[in-house]
Amino acid sequence: MATDIRAELKNCGVSAQKVRLVVDLVRGKPAVQALDLLKFTPKVAAFHVHKVLASAVANAEENFGVSRDELYIYRITADEAPTRKWRIFGARGRFKPLLRRASHITVVLRERE
């Protein structure tokens, strides 16, 4: 049975919809290739996904003694985090709701067999 190496980023300040665009680019790829791809992807979410993926690779090397060349992305998800809600008061007694969306990013790596 293969060992799962995990890393998570909670309450990332980018919406899950925007993070999923980046996550779909790297799903199933080798970890080293995915890190290179994320480094040159012009999206704000790519920075956060790169950070989590680099952390997962470091966990694999430090805690499990696995070479980074043998790792691939087994599972990567971007889920919704709690939304911060507040309002801006408008004319005639109305208000306009503001939603600040966040996301949780989870990366699971496995070793190639």
Language model region names:
Residues 81-113:
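Strongly charged
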Residues 1-78, 103-113:
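Ribosome large-subunit tunnel/peptidyl-transferase-proximal elements
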